[in-house]
């Protein structure tokens, strides 16, 4: 074991926001204080919080109906509300743009097979391709809408 060094509180907050966005992306229905763990990186001598997933409670495959964390407007899965809550942070916008640029569900499925050696059954692959394809479309559309709203606000302020 090793002694953990102090971590920057700002970094922990950013990671938590990113993980909360991911939970929203996968429609996590079992988000609670018990579903978090600590990952230790012995090489870098650091730790970070990480979500723990019950696979039957995300990607619309589960039946649990528990309380899900909401955004300031009370929504559970709407990306627009999440973007409005955190869109004033430059690092957050950069992160979202990287997600949009790098998203490739087919590559993720292939990487899963390469890393685990397990072939995902066709019907399950199709479910995830459809689910993540739809969520990505909603994600990207909501982000573009927020950007357009921000540009419109700036233009209105310039006119005044």
Where are these regions (language model features)?
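Conserved kinase catalytic-core segment
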Residues: 1-64
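C-terminal catalytic region of ATP-dependent kinase domains
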Residues: 42-160
